[in-house]
Amino acid sequence: MIQVLLVIICLEAFPYQGSSIILESGNVNDYEVVYPRKVTALSKGAVHPKYEDAMQYEFKVNGEPVVLHLEKNKGLFSEDYSEIHYSPDGREITTYPLVEDHCYYHGRIQNDADSSASISACNGLKGHFKLQGEMYLIEPFKLPDSEAHAVFKYENVEKEDEAPKMCGVTETNWESDEPIKKASLLNLTPEQQAYLDAKKYVEFVVVLDHGMYKKYKDDLDKIKRRIYEIVNTMNEMFIPLNICVALTGLEIWSKGDKINVTSESWFTLILFTNWRGADLLKRKSHDNAQLLTNTDFDGSTIGRAHIGSMCHPYLSVGIIQDYSPVNLLVASTMAHEMGHNLGMHHDNDTCTCGAPSCVMAAAISKDPSKLFSNCSQEYQRKYLIKNRPQCLLNKPLRTDIISPPVCGNELLEVGEECDCGTPENCRDPCCNATTCKLTPGSQCVEGLCCDQCRFRKTGTECRAAKHDCDLPESCTGQSADCPMDDFQRNGHPCQNNNGYCYNGKCPTMENQCIDLVGPKATVAEDSCFKDNQKGNDYGYCRKENGKKIPCEPQDVKCGRLYCNDNSPGQNNPCKCIYFPRNEDRGMVLPGTKCADGKVCSNRHCVDVATAY
């Protein structure tokens, strides 16, 4: 039995001298100082790696001893993980850091079944853990030759801004709860069931704007550590959904922004969407990207994303404001926006996750959550059944996720052609469970273009077109995977020439009126749109430094949207929607037809050929 000395020091005698963003802010009301003691599990004389796969630490919380069990998060980075920043003269600098022996862990508290932890062990212990239903943060002091750490409850961190923080996603034409309740009862085809059962992988890229670079004093290492800690927590949140979020790239706009990052979150999302599809995806293969910005979005918005867009070459993105020094809060927001990409909508009052608030709540709770609700899980399940996004089946473990290959663990790893589990449990005729190689004559195990262990014939449709702006995909005869979901070129006429395709959708004013006002709504007369020349809350085109800029006469149909309600008892032929906390809502969406042959682009009504 190892004798462990645990010391708690009176706070008055131990002024903070560390480097923590949270503690340095002076916003922590109360914390205790502890000395975590590592309890080694390695035998005497064994070679100690720098960061072991599993570790235990003992320390006290509120005078009671706790044992923190940690396991290295081997799914955090992909092997081809790369980092990009820019030199002062604008040159792109790409590096491939060695991340095999990283220091990021998930964990739990001994004898607490409801506990969890996300910890960086790079220089002391930094992160958070849940103990007896309460969230605690732990951070090391920056003191010479000291193992002292601060432990404090999340509730003891004073909030600089008590205003509610909201997700900017505001679609109102969401499906009712009834179909969601029935989603788990659907009769699934064998292919659908196989897709649901397969482990999913999101190859994830984080982009930081120039404001973030300046916020962290041009310190690339400090920025990287923060992102690693955040994604480590994100990764943990998706484990119960059988999804591994693997960081495959980090891009830092150290020279200057690649897009116009503005306080109008919807506009910034559109610009980042276009940049990702036209630029980033061509340089770095990935499934999903998020922009983390220091820009303060208008109103209470702190994030925004496209719903049901995972794997889309443009729309699989989100944008997030770095609004808090608490990594858990930002990680929860990033997980929330990725949840939208995976088909999840906001929770309502009937949704539960066993905590006061869940990840997909529209407003960020004072009690941060790491749990997805039952509604979120059913939304995601229904989205996966209907769309079966193929990029999630790309198994980064084959060449990317760092983990020693073990045949029989049902994870496809380096050197394996398949892995169906142990010989006793494997029922797959395409895979040899003993060797993790394909059986003789087999070409594949699973995929939309795999049928009875063979590739489907060239030209076999594997994904039908969903609407006017989508395109069908067909098997190549050379792969088990259905090709990446593609869509009509931007500017292609859609919905009987009432609109033009834009990033795979057909935005029309009529549909936007129905979404905002109600099922009987129609687009208002042209005269109503003249109010957009006033430059006030109810009529403008753009904002500059918080000031509403009037529309030019030719651009009035690219500002605030005006609708005719047409509901019984309503007599408002020029109705517009204005939300002070989310001013972007109610504006005509980018790509919307504003005249024959013209679309809204950057809040101007321009020729389709000019826009695209």
From Swiss-Prot:
Question: Where does this protein hold Ca(2+) 2?
Answer: 406, 409, 411, 413, 416, 419
Characterize the regulation of its activity. Answer: Inhibited by EDTA and o-phenanthroline. Not inhibited by PMSF, benzamidine, irreversible serine-proteinase inhibitors and cysteine proteinase inhibitor E-64.
| Disulfide bond as UniProt keyword | yes
The catalytic site is made up of 337
Q: Which residues are glycosylated?
A: 260, 348, 374, 432
- Organism domain of life: Eukaryota
Required co-factor(s) are: Zn(2+)
Positions that bind Ca(2+) 3: 470-471, 473, 485
Q: Which Pfam families match?
A: ADAM_CR, Disintegrin, Pep_M12B_propep, Reprolysin
Instruction: Decide whether keyword Metal-binding is in the record.
Output: yes
One GO MF term on file is: metal ion binding
Q: Which cysteines are joined by disulfide bonds?
A: 311-391, 351-375, 353-358, 407-436, 418-431, 420-426, 430-453, 444-450, 449-475, 462-482, 469-501, 494-506, 513-563, 528-574, 541-551, 558-600, 594-605
Taking the first listed entry, what is the main subcellular location of this protein, grouped into a coarse class? secreted
Residue positions annotated to bind Zn(2+) are 336, 340, 346
User: Which PROSITE patterns does its entry note?
Assistant: ADAM_MEPRO, DISINTEGRIN_1, DISINTEGRIN_2, ZINC_PROTEASE
One Gene Ontology term from the biological process aspect of the record: proteolysis
Q: How does activity depend on pH?
A: Optimum pH is 8.0-9.0.
Expressing tissues: Expressed by the venom gland.
Instruction: Indicate the segments forming the Peptidase M12B domain, all copies.
Output: 200-396
Q: Which GO terms describe its cellular component?
A: extracellular region; plasma membrane
Q: Where is the signal peptide?
A: 1-20
Give the location in the cell.
Answer: Secreted
> Which ranges of residues are annotated as propeptide in this record?
21-187
Q: What SUPFAM superfamilies does the database record attribute to this sequence?
A: Blood coagulation inhibitor (disintegrin), Metalloproteases ('zincins'), catalytic domain
Subunit field text: Monomer.
What protein does this entry describe?
Zinc metalloproteinase-disintegrin-like berythractivase
What is the phylogenetic placement of the source species in the record?
A: Eukaryota, Metazoa, Chordata, Craniata, Vertebrata
